[in-house]
């Protein structure tokens, strides 16, 4: 439904240790180059793909859902790998970002996993209110600015996450 409405690509993701795992995908053909005339995103992530949690919007949403003590255990002694020049690798900065995600209840991450790409994520909660997954949309910076993502896609992501809630 989200893809039909927006022509964007969406994923559902879960936390597995220090990584996030894509467990569902919906979207356009992501293998086409981002530089192509169609503007379709070259973001070749597939079902089962694993990414470091600290570099993704989904990972940050899922880390923000952890109790503080559990997040501290997750972070303690961890090397935060750099994937781009924009990747946060400092534990204090990551902690600050996670606090902001907790306050906002969503995360927008720009160019931390891949240059020219940003992603917006929201938590997916079960009926007990526990975050069990994150739902995201990924787009090229040039085609879909952050303000547009927040204005147009954030309400759709929140609505979709709320629709999923009774099913999990």
Predicted features along the sequence, with ranges:
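Short, basic/aromatic recognition patches
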Residues: 1, 5, 75-121, 159, ...
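Amphipathic alpha-helical effector-binding/dimerization core
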Residues: 1-77
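Residues at helix C-cap/C′ positions in short coil/turn segments immediately following an alpha-helix
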Residues: 6, 16, 102, 131-133
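Juxtadomain coupling helices with adjacent low-complexity linkers
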Residues: 104, 131-168
């Amino acid at each position: 439904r989200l893809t039909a409405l927006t022509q964007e690509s969406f994923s559902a993701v879960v936390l597995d240790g220090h990584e996030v795992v894509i467990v569902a995908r919906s979207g356009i053909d992501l293998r086409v180059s981002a530089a192509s005339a169609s503007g379709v995103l070259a973001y070749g992530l597939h079902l089962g793909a694993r990414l470091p949690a600290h570099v993704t919007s989904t990972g940050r949403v899922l880390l923000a859902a952890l109790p503080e003590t559990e997040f501290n255990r997750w972070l303690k002694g961890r090397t935060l790998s750099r994937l781009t020049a924009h990747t946060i690798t400092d534990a204090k900065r990551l902690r600050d970002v996670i606090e902001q995600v907790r306050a906002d209840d969503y995360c927008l991450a720009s160019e931390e996993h891949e240059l020219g790409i940003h992603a917006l994520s929201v938590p997916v909660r079960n009926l007990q209110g526990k975050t069990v997954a994150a739902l995201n949309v990924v787009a090229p910076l040039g085609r879909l600015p952050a303000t547009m993502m927040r204005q147009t896609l954030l309400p759709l992501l929140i609505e979709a996450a709320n629709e999923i809630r009774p099913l999990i």
